[in-house]
Amino acid sequence: MSPASAASAESARVVSVAAGMEKTDRATPVRDGRHQALAVLIGNWINEGATVATADIPTAAIRTSDVYEWVPGGFFVVHTAFGKIGDTSVGGVSIIGVDGEAYDDTFYDSFGNAHRSRLEIDGDVHRWIGVDGRARCTVTMTDGGMTQVAHHESSVDGVTWTASMDVVLRKVI
């Protein structure tokens, strides 16, 4: 075996061992267009907007910094966020990965909660739909992918939806 093919075989084995698949019949994942569709998110973003006032709660300003980065290998995106909603410090981290023709996104917030969403991408429109049926967000990418216009909604019954916040994220890097 030539040194080049030995190195290639060793590299393939390392990938299989790291993925826990060395002795399974699972196919090694292949990065494809579904992964590439997430590339528009990659970068540093400044998020500004406000919550939508209710009869009981006034509007609160939102200002956060969001960073989307590829996890090594390019199969997953990690999203970190921190900032303020009103006077409250907020933050968290999520991992976004391919799940069939859509994506799974689990966000772990600074209050100890985990929020699972299904992300669907249709051209410049990205829709996050909470698996619990209580939250959803529609993002329209504009300015060649440099701006995200996001409309968040919540529901107590999964049928009737109420606007909860509107924000604009601008890519700074």
Label each residue range with its predicted role.
Residues 1-63, 67-69, 168, 172-173:
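Amphipathic/hydrophobic helical signal segments and adjacent flexible N-terminal regions
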Residues 28-35, 47-49, 53-136:
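Central antiparallel beta-sheet cores of small beta-barrel/beta-sandwich binding domains
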Residues 57-59, 159-163:
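Beta-sandwich strand segments
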Residues 72-73, 143, 173:
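Residue-level recognition of beta-strand termini and adjacent short loop/turns
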Residues 140-146:
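Beta-rich strand-turn-strand
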Residues 147-151:
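Beta-strand/loop substructures that line and gate deep hydrophobic ligand-binding cavities in soluble
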Residues 153-155:
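Conserved Ser/Thr-centered positions that define the repeating blades of beta-propeller domains
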